[in-house]
Design a protein with these regions (language model features):
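Core Rossmann-like FAD-binding/catalytic domain of the broad FAD-dependent monooxygenase superfamily
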Residues: 1-225
Length: 225
């Protein structure tokens, strides 16, 4: 089977690109290793103003806004910033877990009738003057004019293409987990000590007047730096 563009990776980046190309009249398909769009764990936790502006341009921002939590305050290095005066129609960030972001985007690309080849991975590819043959984990292949790697920071497509990923060494590392706690901690929020910065908070929460109110029950998000 042949497409104009094949996208390796059906996460937020891959689905958004597929939607944009489809709206431009391009025959595009997604190759996604997961059998469904279900996502285990928290991963990303929200959207920023510019992202919401782009979603608004496509007429789908309200799908995210109705499910998320708006916050007009953000923080950096312990300093809080008021976003209410930002020159945008959306002067806030939106708290919304990636599993919900992906579900909403998947519904959008489904409406656009973007084909998604699920449960398979790109294992390699061979280019020529007219396109690229994409090898798949099932032992078959697909043909396209272009292959786009939207398969994450450890992108197999990027590595196979020999594309460098320059940058500086990390100065900190983070561990993120979801846990069921036997006892409720005395205090939610961010802690700082000699070992670094740590945070505890329920995965489900509400934002009211710039303050976070955590759910009484459910898994706890843990961040350790």
């Amino acid at each position: 089977m042949k497409h104009e563009v094949l996208i390796a990776g059906g996460g937020p980046t891959g689905m958004m690109l597929a939607g944009e190309l489809t709206l431009a009249g391009v025959d595009v398909a997604i190759i996604e290793r997961r059998a469904s769009q279900e996502l285990v764990g928290s991963r990303a936790g929200g959207l920023h103003s510019r992202t919401i502006e782009v979603l608004d341009q496509r007429g789908i921002a309200d799908r995210f806004l109705v499910e998320g939590q708006k916050a007009q305050v953000t923080g950096f290095a312990g300093v809080h910033f008021d976003l209410s005066g930002f020159p945008t129609r959306h002067p806030y960030s939106l708290g919304l877990r990636q599993k919900h972001i992906e579900r909403i985007l998947a519904g959008w690309v489904d409406e656009l009738k973007v084909p998604i080849y699920r449960g398979i991975e790109v294992t390699g590819f061979a280019q020529d003057d007219t396109g690229v043959d994409v090898e798949l984990s099932e032992g078959c292949s697909l043909r396209a004019h272009y292959l786009v790697g939207c398969d994450g920071g450890r992108s197999r497509v990027r590595k196979a293409a020999g594309i460098a990923f320059p940058g500086s060494d990390p100065t900190t590392s983070n561990l993120i987990a979801e846990a069921e706690l036997a006892e409720t901690p005395p205090e939610w929020g961010i802690r700082r000590d000699a070992l670094g910065i740590h945070a505890l908070g329920r995965v489900e929460y509400e934002i009211r007047n710039g303050e976070i109110f955590y759910a009484d029950h459910g898994p706890v998000g843990v961040l350790v730096t």
